[in-house]
């Protein structure tokens, strides 16, 4: 059971996620995994089997033990024992004992979901034994509570990007550690780190470390860097095959085969994959591609033989069972092929490759049974039909079955699919079909589908498959004036790390279709994040907004359509605001531009961005009004930005009031800044993020002569737990902790604490290695200079350190230095504003 959060945030999410504002809990279940961040592996075409059993336990409430035979609760708070069962149980003996002494005993007869409750004196510190034995003597439960499980609590899993985590690539001591950490971030889909960054450091430490070499080769395959991948394989092969040409682990030759396949070196790939099959661990995936190449050569006997070889490793193989049946059909065993396909479909109704092959061949032979028609095939595609059919088509094209591959995509044009999919045939489905038809010599059909695709640049799924690079290159080659093909090719090339080539594609798309706003926006992303032209991103985004407002905003449209149009504009304005902010644009100019171009109905994100823009020019009442007049339902993890915008604006207002001698009004601001308004429907992920609001409240109380109240408030910051739970708790939080320590009378230790922090911050400022910007779900397309951002954050902290020791001049100098590195620091800007006043 998973609850979203505690305190205000927990209450907010309970309200957001329930109809009656009751308690919300999320059921979390898995197999082959012990916890959410714990993973296992599934190999290509491997099938894992698992079972899950669910039954109601509401009667017993929180169980101390549960299995397939029942659940038992030991409710120490209410001094109750409860038992329930998932199936009818008659005359079973139920006992709860402590040290051999039975404290509860009964013969129970229960129906499913019924429960019995017993009074019992339960000791909070004791470990009880639970037993349930059927009337025929079978032991259904036998469990003794293990208190050690509660004692052995794991340590916090500190965020990678924190220096103290010890998980950064150059912090790890060995190539092995870097390889394992890289493997973990890949499994965890970490948004800021990629496995390749760790593998490269592993190879700095040990250039012959084979696991990292193979991992880099795999990464190169996944990003279509085939030639580079072969270089890593050559290095690994030189080490691994120094004395033995046949290593135990066949992945080195399997990935070599894939890389050769990616380069369209079919013969070399075939030979290399055979070499890979000498090792047991890659027989199934290697034989799959071997069987496909056999199909390309129309060697159906070999295709059948090699598909069967793969099936000996994985009897429920997702591809080779169908390849085997297709080979039988091609060899003339029609009845055997159809029988195999029917068996596959009966065992797995979601095997769409087999379902299509069955519909295709049954229709060709005139032996279609119930549920086997083409209409049945398309009618059961409940997820995106085009994506499923592209997958099927590419599996068929691998084996040279162009007629079937074309047929599965052609059927999308007229298919009646599940009602949620209004346009079953997507842009990429048209381009893929055009590519298949073109290779088959049907230029007329290919041209027709490319023409249709070119008219639909807005897609629901971006191209991501390696094969789609070739599909789009084919489209661009066939029609160099196809802006949609250039645009989509740029998208997939950017995803595969070909940044400069992607930008050229988007540039061409913008030239060919200047009224299509997305290429302009994508060029801004590339220039800002990858091409070293951050300043150029602003003009590109302004162009995107100009184009969008001209071509995508129709004031005569219906309300629902207008909202959709506004959502697109909202994103562009939000992104431009971010870029201008990061690049140090004049605050008033930025705010005026955003206010001129913002849509009538704002998203949550743009609302708090505008509030921050008002705070940036010190108009805190307007910032607070923006936040007050909007109804928020913040997305997960974005609450932090909303609450920070609110707390910061109120604290700044309070500090200005305090300068005017209005202490009561200032105190009210500081206190309100720590309580979320109802319209926010949010809270703090970590209430320690209120560290500065807490200090200003305490300091104001002290200024008012209310010393005891002030110290009680200051105690909320001491001790301070560095949990890394909130991205807004920058290093300067320790400055406020030290201030609170000093207020509480511990002057010596506060100075030691501050001195220790300053020394750490100075080291961080000097460190340019392994830096990443703070991850945000809002602007991750725009990747700022992580080294500058880190230096800026720690320089701000050093400025506060100067303030602690009374050096205002030194603090001002450091604040200015920090803003030159990263102009997007409202705290530094406001401190300078106060100093100047």
Where are these regions (language model features)?
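A contiguous, surface-exposed recognition patch within enzymatic or periplasmic domains that forms
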Residues: 1-47, 55
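Long, contiguous interaction/recruitment modules in multidomain scaffold/adaptor proteins
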Residues: 65-173, 354, 435, 439-465, ...
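Residue-level recognition of tetratricopeptide repeat
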Residues: 183-184, 209, 218, 243, 249, 258, 283, 292, ...
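Single-residue signature of alpha-solenoid repeat helices
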Residues: 195, 229, 269, 303, ...
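Hydrophobic/aromatic packing residues within the alpha-helices of TPR/SEL1-like helical repeat arrays
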Residues: 199, 233, 273, 307, ...
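TPR alpha-solenoid repeat register
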Residues: 212, 246, 252, 286, ...
